[in-house]
Swiss-Prot record:
Its main location: plastid. The gene is AL1. SMART domains: RAP. This is RAP domain-containing protein, chloroplastic. Gene3D superfamilies: VSR Endonuclease. One of its GO terms (biological process) is regulation of mitochondrial mRNA stability. Residues 111-158 are annotated as: Disordered. It holds the Pfam family RAP. It comes from Oryza sativa subsp. japonica. Residues 147-158 have a biased composition (Acidic residues). Residues 137-146 have a biased composition (Basic and acidic residues). It is found in: Plastid, Chloroplast. Keywords: Chloroplast, Plastid, RNA-binding, rRNA processing, Transit peptide. The lineage of its organism: Eukaryota, Viridiplantae, Streptophyta, Embryophyta, Tracheophyta.
């Protein structure tokens, strides 16, 4: 009889659902006792206690266990001695059941319930008072949580969550559950660390009185430091001293910008590996220094904003400092009228190297660059044009100003500057700058600068402008013997000039400006060498390429079209397929970068039907079947 009661009842005759109900056998009256009392043998309702398993326990056990027990009513006053659902063949449910019994034996069920069960909504009668209570709750410090009152804990967590969301914050389910571990220990620790971090940052107020001698001494020590670690150690020492009561702080906005600039410069001096830079950037002291820089950014000079932007691009590359670059863009727009040509070029170059799109900032920098057109040095002009082209932002005001300068001058002359005979290197000190003179404009470019400008005009589609014509003519001064496939600088120059020349042939044949003779032959020969055409196939490309074979067509992979390598093509149909990974798009907005837009435009102009697949689209697909159907749809194979 007892064994029969513990087994789940059979299924209902007409599709009914089996409900497992656990009985408390100890309360059943025995047959002898019933006979002695002279009463008939039957199961009286008070003699059997039947209750459903709480919903939070079913949630913990999983969906498999949920079908084996009655969901019942949610009971706030939990009986932890209730029997669990009937045995199941699912080993996961059995393992969770054993863990649940162990947790109950240790008296930790309330903590587990707070982790598993979602916070309950508290019904409030008056809406007018609800808003005031939440605002007051957010302003006042939270009292310690009472672990003895589970319901109060749930209501308090609900208030905290609502206050956070009302303040513009977001909290996902995972963060909410982690915050409730160990009676909120991790949440409290996070809040303490956050308050300590804010308190440390507030100690460095730009409006505080200054100590000139300490500031100058610290600045000298930062400049004289030979390694990035030495610079960071100096700033960490000052931060610790300020936390202990040093006032005023010698770590002014100028010294903060100088420290970041010297850290990046020392990294560049030793060619530090990217992995080491990223590890350095994630250290506690470095995070504190970057946080101080963001706080002091509005008080920095235009040169300080430029130095911080350049430093972050060298330290974090395109992997870190996304919100920091957004803040730099906001502050730089307010200070752009005070920027000089160097500041304009450095800020644009740093955003381009980090693949961080900022259209409003680039637009403001372009207007400022057009005003400063006569003060640009050759390197600054090449860097700014390259930055705009890399982000696919055309600087129309600056291009118009350059064309106007060329037309207004009686003689416009561009020269090729070679610092060391027989070696092609960039010059650190330029011999001249673009000056506002009524007689002539003399530009003394290096080979790499001409390559950057030529590539920028090709990417922007502005090769029919007078300024580009004057720059392009200087290529006739090159000596072909100085181009080799053994140097990275040579390969970069060849790739830029070769693509610009091919664009002139294909998109601007009416200009009749393409290179001819030995120079074109040497560029083409170097561009087709094995060292120049080294290919790297990502796992994303391999995954998509494998599914391409399932479309029923024979694809030619890694096909070359006039210097461009296309991932896969159908030659007979003139169909080109490009697989664009994250490096083809800006990291924050997901817009195509300049080199991607130029490649698409060039392949389409060459007569190919180009179809592109971005990694964002691919990540939204689930399963190979859906991926294959998507490929067939974008390639136009649905009708087959």
């Amino acid at each position: 009889m007892e064994a029969a009661l513990l087994r789940p009842p059979p299924l209902a005759a007409r599709g009914g659902v089996s409900i497992a109900i656990a009985f408390s056998v100890s309360r059943l009256p025995s047959a002898a006792a019933a006979a002695a009392a002279g009463k008939p043998r039957k199961l009286a309702p008070p003699a059997c206690r039947c209750r459903a398993t709480p919903q939070w326990q079913l949630d913990f056990l999983g969906a498999e266990a949920d079908t084996e027990a009655d969901g019942g009513d949610d009971d706030d006053d939990l009986d932890l001695d209730l029997s669990l659902p009937a045995e199941t063949n699912d080993w996961c449910v059995r393992a969770r059941r054993s863990a649940l019994r162990s947790i109950e034996a240790r008296g930790l069920s309330p903590s587990l319930q707070r982790m598993v069960a979602s916070p309950k909504k508290k019904n409030k009668k008056k809406k007018s008072k609800k808003t005031n209570l939440k605002q007051k709750k957010a302003a006042e410090p939270k009292p310690p949580r009472d672990t003895d009152d589970d319901e109060d804990d749930e209501e308090e967590a609900d208030d905290d969550l609502e206050a956070l969301l009302a303040g513009g914050g977001e909290l996902d389910d995972l963060e909410l559950r982690v915050a409730q571990f160990a009676d909120g220990m991790f949440d409290e620790k996070r809040q303490r660390n956050r308050e300590q971090f804010i308190q440390t940052l507030s100690a460095f107020s730009p409006a505080a009185p200054s100590n000139r001698s300490q500031e100058v001494s610290l600045n000298r020590s930062i400049v004289e430091a030979r390694t990035a670690d030495e610079v960071l150690a100096l700033t960490a020492e000052v931060v610790a001293a300020v936390a202990k009561g040093l006032s005023p702080s010698p770590l002014t906005p100028l010294n903060i910008a100088t420290a970041l600039h010297r850290i990046a410069k020392n990294m560049e001096a030793v060619s530090m590996l990217q992995t080491h830079r990223l590890g350095f950037a994630r250290s506690r002291d470095m995070s504190m220094l970057v946080g101080l820089a963001m706080v002091a950014l509005p008080e920095c000079s235009p040169q300080g904003v430029s130095n911080i932007s350049w430093a972050l691009s060298k330290i974090g590359g395109d992997l870190l400092y996304l919100p920091e670059m957004d803040r730099i863009a906001q502050v730089a727009i307010t200070k752009v009228d005070s920027f000089n040509a160097q500041n304009v070029a450095n800020v644009a170059g740093s955003f381009a190297s980090m693949r961080h799109s900022a259209p409003d900032l680039i637009s403001a920098l372009t207007r400022r660059a057009a005003e400063l057109v006569y003060t640009f040095k050759e390197q600054e002009l090449a860097q700014f044009l390259w930055g705009c082209a890399s982000l696919n932002e055309c600087p129309y005001p600056l291009l118009d100003a350059l064309d106007t300068a060329c037309r207004d001058a009686p003689s416009f002359d561009c020269h090729l500057h070679d610092t060391v005979p027989g070696m092609w290197q960039s010059s650190d000190k330029e011999a001249s700058s673009l000056k506002n003179s009524s007689n002539a404009y003399a530009l003394n470019f290096t080979r790499d600068q001409i390559g950057n400008i030529a590539w920028s005009y090709a990417v922007l589609g502005q090769m029919d402008r007078p300024f580009f014509s004057g720059i392009w003519k200087t290529l006739s001064q090159f000596e072909e013997r100085k181009i080799s496939d053994q140097y990275r600088e040579d390969m970069m120059f060849v790739s830029q000039v070769y693509l610009a020349n091919q664009s002139l042939k294909l998109e601007y044949p009416h200009l009749d400006m393409c290179l001819r003779g030995d120079l074109e032959e040497n560029l083409t020969k170097t561009g087709r060498s094995k060292r120049f055409n080294q290919k790297m196939t990502s796992s994303f490309q391999k995954e998509v390429g494998r599914l391409l074979c399932s479309t029923g067509h024979e694809w030619n992979k890694e096909y070359t079209i006039d210097g461009y390598t296309v991932d896969a093509v159908l030659v007979d149909e003139k169909l080109a397929f490009e697989i664009d990974g994250p490096s083809h798009f800006s990291r924050n907005l997901g817009t195509p970068l300049g080199h991607t837009a130029f490649k698409r435009r060039y392949i389409a102009a060459a007569g190919w039907n180009l179809v592109s697949l971005s990694h964002q689209e691919w990540e939204n697909l689930e399963g190979e079947f859906e991926q294959l159907e998507y490929l067939r749809r974008i390639l136009g194979f649905d009708a087959e």
